[in-house]
A protein has these predicted regions:
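Hydrophobic pocket/interface hotspot
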Residues: 19-20, 29, 48, 65, ...
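Intrinsic-disorder/low-complexity, polar/charged segments enriched in Ser/Thr/Lys/Arg/Asp/Glu/Gln
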Residues: 3-9, 47, 60, 73, ...
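Glycine-rich portal/gate segments that line the openings of hydrophobic small-molecule binding cavities
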Residues: 39-79
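Beta-strand/loop substructures that line and gate deep hydrophobic ligand-binding cavities in soluble
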Residues: 79-125, 131
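Hydrophobic/aromatic beta-strand elements that line small-molecule binding cavities or substrate pockets
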Residues: 10, 61-66, 88-95
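Short, highly charged C-terminal tails/helix-capping segments
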Residues: 133-147
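Hydrophobic ligand-binding cavity/cleft-lining segments
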Residues: 1-39, 43
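A short, structured loop/turn motif at beta-sheet edges
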Residues: 16-17, 66-72, 93-102
Length: 147
């Protein structure tokens, strides 16, 4: 049986550089990703975390940077910190098209029977909608209500 792969494509009226910063800079990710920050030096082989900030940070997702070619290509492993054996892979591809960008997010390599598939298939549409709103209007969406 083939492992599931989730693919999301969204067009955003912004530049490659602004979209890249929105994905990789904690001061921006927290504005559209439910208050959570993506933290790393974004070098190949480095760890990354999706984390709350403050006195007692809570790690929601952890992984490793597999490939990083700013501002167009980023590949990460993705795992719940309590179950790193259930590791998947996320690829961000960014392409400039006239006065906008096309962002393709591919999330795959899920372990058979993974509960992560359900979680991320709920989360990615919300994250990407909020990201688009943030970059086009300066405000992320409150898509995490009722969570």
């Amino acid at each position: 049986m083939e492992k599931p792969k989730l693919v999301y494509v969204i067009y955003i009226r912004t530049t490659l550089q602004k979209l890249w910063a929105a994905i990789t800079k904690p001061q921006f990710t927290r504005e559209y990703w439910g208050g959570l920050a993506n933290v790393s030096d974004w070098k190949k082989g480095s760890p990354w975390q999706h984390v709350t900030e403050g006195k007692k940070p809570e790690i929601y997702i952890t992984g490793q940077v597999l490939e990083c070619i700013p501002p167009k290509h980023l590949v990460l492993t993705w795992a719940d910190p309590d179950d790193s054996a259930e590791q998947s892979r996320v690829t961000f591809e960014i392409e400039a098209i006239e006065d906008m960008t096309c962002l393709t997010v591919t999330h795959g390599n899920f372990k058979a029977g993974s509960t992560m598939v359900r979680k991320v298939s709920w989360g990615w549409p919300r994250v990407l909608s909020s990201l688009k709103s943030f970059l086009e209007t300066g405000k992320g969406l409150k898509v995490w209500a009722g969570r």
